[in-house]
Amino acid sequence: MIKKYNTNCKGNVIKKQTLLMKYTPLVFLPVLFCFSSVLFSCSHDDLEKKKDPTTENPKPDEGPQNPDTPGTPGNNAGVKDLISKQQFLELFPYRYGAEQSNNWIVNPSKDFYTYDALMKAVDLMADLKVVIERKGWFQKITRTKKSTNETKVIREDADFSASWNNNVVVRQEVDYADFISIGSLEVRKRELAAFLANISHETTGGWSTAPGGAYSWGLHFREEVGYDENSTTGYREENNVDYPPVAKKSYHGRGPIQLSWNYNYGQISEFLYADKNVLLKNPENVVKDAALAFQTAIWFWMTPQAPKPSCHAVMAGLWLPTQQDINEGRKPGFGATINIINGALECNKADNDKTQSRRGFYQRYLTVLNTSDPNCECQCDKMQPFK
């Protein structure tokens, strides 16, 4: 889950870090950068959350609540080259909809995390790119929808252009069509395995003696157990000026990355719809539309959270550690993705069940995808968190 962790940077890490980042004058989400205001916040396991396996699969709201369909072909052809529908089913035999009353066979009427939904999400994301400009802790984000060439500033901190802010502008462009499409075949397979492993850990329903093994239970939960849309609310940061919570709405963990907290829902809503209010007003849409749910996970994976690189950059071989990174033990590899997602809680300490879970999923998925990572820097026990 994206967890909240709160650090000092007007928006730093973050929630169980359920995964996204907090953006308040400067917070990223899950941990992202702690730069809530900056981008998002991104720690995922602050508070161990349980997800609800019994909720029915409602239909998504119509109209503006759902991202529009891209006008040009997306990037899923590349992802399809790496994983077939049959392999997807092999990876996730006990995904959401698998019920004990039915011998843990997925109920077709409740099947949510489908192969087709993932491919649709990849296509939708491929139509979007952003330019992130930072001046110190403050940022400006410009979004472009490629099929229409429509460009819009979706976030600009008040002090980004302040007369006193003499910081040099640091500019990054993120093209979401690059998801699992950069590098050699082996590099791309490893990135796909790493992405699926991390979202599997966030949504796992497995245990050591579970049918099929503990690492066959990724994507089992759709949202946290104990929450429903009518009575229980949580993960509301009431005093958040940029992304104020809507009355009676709950921002608990939902989707593959377990998106949590109103500031995270607001940020992903800005990105997808150029309007923060769509998901602030309708956070439940994340569990009504499986493609949207996968989009939240891809967004988190692809978006850098300064001073952190994106998980994509790490696995695609695009991240070059600074001398400070080297001094603090941070190296490219799967372990660095754990550090990005939830380093403050899982890294720079004795290896633990959470990091072992992520690695277990990663190794299994590499095998199913017919590849390996022989020189893997898979652990983060000697890596200091990004800060």
Predicted region positions:
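Bacterial Sec-dependent N-terminal signal peptides
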Residues: 31, 35-70
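Extracellular low-complexity, O-glycosylation-prone Ser/Thr/Pro/Gly-rich "stalks"
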Residues: 60-100, 318-387
